[in-house]
Amino acid sequence: MTMTDPIADMLTRIRNANVVKHETVDVPASNMKKELARILLEEGFIRGYDVIEDGKQGIIRIQLKYGQEGERVITGLKKISKPGMRVYAANHEIPKVLNGLGISVISTSKGILTDKQARKENVGGEVICYVW
């Protein structure tokens, strides 16, 4: 069975594992998912990720991050652009998440960027998701 929205599946797996406080979560690999994991790592939302080659598609193993007392670092993940309704933002319309406390992930002509990076590069694109 094919998956209609693999990015939404990745976000849901992370959200579910985060709620039950798993240390790691495995998602099927793709280039876009690797870039999304890289951004989550750079922004400090996860501890790390590894790409595991299994002879097929590959797996991304994401190490989730928690605070000193076990509180979740990722409090929310929301998919914005969906297969049935794509959401695009020009460089001057890029949304801020929780007034700058979260990030929006944007697919641009210069690759997958955060909202801050896209504003700095002066590019717009498809708003993939919000993370806070």
From Swiss-Prot:
Superkingdom of the source species: Bacteria
GO MF, one annotated term: rRNA binding
UniProt entry tagged with the keyword tRNA-binding: no
Keywords, ordered alphabetically: Ribonucleoprotein, Ribosomal protein, RNA-binding, rRNA-binding
UniProt cross-references to InterPro entries, sorted A to Z: Ribosomal_uS8, Ribosomal_uS8_CS, Ribosomal_uS8_sf
One GO biological process term: translation
A GO CC term assigned to this protein in UniProt: ribosome
Biological role stated in the UniProt entry: One of the primary rRNA binding proteins, it binds directly to 16S rRNA central domain where it helps coordinate assembly of the platform of the 30S subunit.
Quaternary data: Part of the 30S ribosomal subunit. Contacts proteins S5 and S12.
Family: Belongs to the universal ribosomal protein uS8 family.
Protein's name in the database: Small ribosomal subunit protein uS8
